[in-house]
């Protein structure tokens, strides 16, 4: 959420920029699963690009010296910034590059009023694309930066992100993302099911290989080596 944090000072007068407000990343399992699905899907999409930083629920401080000006998008993407661990995203330490794309998943604790505050924050501090999804109503709201600022997009059916190239689909009753080449962003459960299936197929292949080796040995015992 957009946090109004108490500004503390070190003995030398240096401003402290907290890495957390002690609040959980998500209020419920549905919100958490969507956040993880989006974040991990983007990680995979940009796995070979060292200059794309992706984070979930990370404090973003856009203004140096102003620790009260902070928000933590559910997921944010900063193109042009290196991968790596950060306690928070201090924009003045990131070549003054603001996250270009942010995602928010609506939850009971983050209602429309809170989201309106976040919209103003993203508008003011340079976000190019803002995606807000309501999992209860299955509604996707999209804002894109124009010369007038962050402007709502009217037709969001099968919307494709200009920055990321990913496609948004809500026709199945929930938000589903696809990469530009049509690959689906999988949930944690789906990934585990596919892993289990792959392991079963591997076990079956190993069993067939063992059976073939047994048959081959029986042939050798009876007839000798196979002719070359």
Give the ranges of each region predicted by the language model.
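C-terminal interaction segment
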Residues: 2-27, 41-44, 60-73, 78-101, ...
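A structured, charge-rich N-terminal accessory region that forms the first stable segment of a protein
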Residues: 27, 32-45, 53
């Amino acid at each position: 959420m957009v946090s109004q944090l108490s500004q503390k000072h070190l003995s030398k007068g240096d401003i402290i920029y907290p890495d957390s407000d002690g609040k959980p990343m998500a209020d419920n399992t549905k919100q958490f699963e969507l956040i993880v699905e989006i974040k991990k899907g983007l990680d995979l999409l940009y796995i070979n690009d060292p200059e794309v930083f992706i984070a979930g629920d990370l404090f973003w401080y856009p203004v140096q010296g102003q620790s009260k000006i902070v928000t933590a998008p559910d997921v944010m993407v900063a193109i042009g910034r290196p991968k790596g661990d950060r306690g928070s995203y201090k924009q003045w330490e990131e070549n003054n590059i603001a996250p270009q794309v942010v995602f928010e998943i609506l939850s009971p604790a983050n209602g429309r009023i809170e989201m309106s505050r976040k919209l103003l924050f993203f508008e003011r501090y340079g976000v190019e694309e803002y995606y807000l999804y309501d999992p209860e109503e299955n509604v996707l709201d999209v804002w894109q930066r124009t010369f007038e600022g962050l402007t709502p997009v009217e037709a969001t059916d099968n919307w494709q992100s200009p920055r990321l190239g990913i496609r948004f689909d809500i026709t199945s009753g929930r938000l589903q993302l696809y990469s530009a080449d049509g690959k689906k962003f999988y949930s944690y459960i789906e990934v585990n099911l596919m892993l289990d299936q792959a392991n079963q197929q591997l076990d079956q292949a190993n069993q067939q290989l063992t059976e073939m080796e047994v048959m081959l040995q029986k042939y050798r015992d009876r007839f000798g080596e196979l002719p070359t």
